[in-house]
UniProtKB/Swiss-Prot annotation:
SUPFAM superfamilies hit by this protein: Sm-like ribonucleoproteins (SSF50182)
One cellular component term from this protein's GO annotations in UniProt: U2-type catalytic step 2 spliceosome
Family: Belongs to the snRNP Sm proteins family. SmF/LSm6 subfamily.
Lineage, uppermost ranks: Eukaryota, Amoebozoa, Evosea, Eumycetozoa, Dictyostelia
Protein name listed in UniProt: Small nuclear ribonucleoprotein F
Gene Ontology molecular-function annotations: RNA binding
Gene: snrpf
UniProt keyword annotation of Ubl conjugation present: no
Alphabetized SMART domains for the sequence: Sm (SM00651)
GO annotation terms (biological process): mRNA splicing, via spliceosome
Top-level taxon in the UniProt lineage: Eukaryota
Length: 91
């Protein structure tokens, strides 16, 4: 079983800039996956090359997306292998 390590949110987000991330929203089973382009002091997020996922199903590309901080449930980094395996499970 893996151990979960607590991290400070701002340094965690700043370290993810330029990397692929997944952002789960508080409602609707919505998740956005894309490259974290920027984050501000309020932790609002700007994603590039974004895809919308609802209830685990890819709904297609959206391009550039801005997500207001109070809508975010969690943010996680994703790697290429993890994303490819999830897409293969979809097919």
């Amino acid at each position: 079983m893996s151990k979960i390590e607590a991290l400070a949110p701002k340094p965690f987000l700043y370290d993810l800039k330029g990397k692929k991330i997944a952002v789960r929203l508080k409602w609707g089973g919505m998740e956005y996956r894309g490259i974290l382009a920027s984050v501000d002091s309020y932790m609002n997020l700007q994603l590039a090359a974004t895809e919308e996922w609802i209830d685990g199903a890819n709904k297609g590309p959206l391009g550039e997306v801005l997500i207001r901080c109070n809508n975010v449930l969690f943010v996680r980094g994703i790697d290429d292998e993890q994303q490819q395996s999830q897409q293969q499970q979809q097919e």
